[in-house]
Amino acid sequence: MEKKTFYITTPIYYPSDKLHIGHSYCTVATDAIARYKRLQGYDVMFLTGTDEHGQKIETKAKEAGMTPQEFVDHIVEGERGILDLWKLMNISNDRFIRTTDDYHCAAIQKIFKTMYEKGDIYKGTYKGKYCTPCESFWTESQLVDGKCPDCGREVKDAEEEAYFFRLSKYADRIQHLLED
């Protein structure tokens, strides 16, 4: 009889600073589920990792006098970094993914190219109020006294070229799935 499979993942954490208790809580909860499923006889794939791209990392790296890659390497692999913490906590993940890994970059580029060629992704411009520490765009109505509703810091007007997913292409299928 073939084993049933079970896939579980934490969010891929954003390593702009040392982890906090929320990261540990989420990872321990995910680990507990993975271990339980293994005890039930499932073939489990437990993934965790880091999303190592973004303005906040670039800014923090510059402040630390490092390149972005050096900065995230220190957070992930350095003494008392993420990998040390997960080892100390005996986390049973099967895979630790880093979005800067060559294989990950190649896979994402292939997926992106395919979706772009099919018209699922298109380039456009996004405008809004931007909070750099939170890496979030906000509308005017979402702001609290003109500041970021999450952290209370000042926001700035920002406009950037971005890629968008053409959700409208799948509207009928999504509607059908929601109704059934």
Where do the PLM segments sit?
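N-terminal, positively charged nucleic-acid-binding surface of large information/translation enzymes
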Residues: M1-D180
